[in-house]
């Protein structure tokens, strides 16, 4: 079997496409494998709209980055023709290994999307040997295609929270469908506060959900979030997220500890002991500190008990 035939099998090429030649460039680092694809003279190609085989003309050369061949970067080059279909006119054909307008093969893009779920895009770009700007174009394309298929007509409850995405007070607000166990994230936008809720409202309307269908919203205690939910989702009951309630009370316990430590000596291990839940693993020093705090008249011990009594709410 010829080397070109082996490469054709590996690429999954079907007629009229075949591997015409191959060349390994060892002068570049990393080395580059170049495969030239084409067809026999006079071959016909399918119309990209109806699939009817038509005569080819007006060839133009394109190159695509493919998955590595062993440790070598691999590139596919082909002269891609136009066809004139009696029904749909003259159009450039769509090659089976890449989507229109992309400089990467479909298999390369598939790997990029898998990696982008697990690591920063800049890291993916360094790993595959290209720029993050080029990869962002790939990611944005597939995200946009996926968003076209999103149906939120049955949305009844959602949760939202902001998280810092970069240094310098830059935030992203994320919205999740509380009834979804698999892939619950349904919207994310830069920024935080009231404007993000308005953008989310516009998004779900475009995806088939009327805001009055939403009956429950889970949020933190941000005043801007609460005001926005009351304005844009008037039928929804607002629930404060358990994590933020505990966070508020934990901060209050720490404030009591700081104030009391200025008036009297506290047991060693108090600082980190009171920041942990009763069921959370502690060092022996922390456990002994909590026991002493609760057995004697320490204000910090009283505050800690109040915080721990919140657990019945969750049950």
Which residues does each PLM region occupy?
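Catalytic center-proximal scaffold of phosphoryl-transfer enzymes
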Residues: 1, 23-27, 90-92, 100-315
């Amino acid at each position: 079997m010829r080397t070109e035939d082996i490469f054709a099998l590996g690429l999954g090429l079907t007629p009229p496409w075949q591997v015409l030649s191959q060349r390994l460039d060892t002068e570049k680092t990393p080395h580059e494998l170049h495969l030239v694809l084409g067809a026999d003279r006079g071959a016909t190609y399918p119309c990209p709209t109806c699939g009817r085989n038509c005569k080819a003309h007006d060839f133009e050369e394109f190159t695509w980055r493919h998955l590595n061949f062993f440790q070598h970067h691999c590139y596919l080059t082909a002269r891609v023709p136009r066809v004139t279909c009696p029904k749909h006119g003259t159009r450039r054909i769509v090659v089976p290994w890449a989507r229109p307008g992309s400089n990467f093969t479909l298999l390369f893009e598939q790997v990029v999307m898998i990696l982008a779920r697990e690591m920063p895009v800049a890291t993916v770009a360094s790993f595959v040997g290209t720029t993050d700007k080029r990869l962002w174009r790939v990611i944005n394309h597939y995200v946009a295609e996926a968003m076209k298929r999103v149906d939120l007509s049955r949305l009844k409850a959602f949760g939202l929270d902001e998280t810092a995405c970069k240094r310098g007070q830059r935030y992203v607000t994320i919205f999740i469908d509380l009834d979804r166990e698999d892939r619950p994230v349904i919207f994310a936008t830069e920024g935080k506060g009231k404007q993000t809720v308005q953008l989310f409202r516009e998004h779900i309307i475009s995806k088939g959900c009327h805001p009055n269908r939403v009956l429950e919203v889970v949020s933190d205690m941000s005043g801007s979030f609460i005001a926005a939910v009351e304005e844009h989702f008037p039928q929804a009951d607002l629930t404060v997220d358990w994590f933020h309630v505990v966070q508020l009370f934990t901060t209050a316990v720490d404030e009591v500890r700081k104030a009391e430590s200025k008036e009297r000596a506290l047991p060693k291990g108090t600082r980190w002991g009171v920041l942990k839940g009763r069921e959370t693993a502690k060092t022996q020093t922390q456990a002994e500190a909590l026991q002493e705090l609760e057995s004697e008249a320490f204000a910090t011990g009283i505050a800690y008990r109040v915080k721990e009594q919140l657990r019945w709410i969750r049950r």
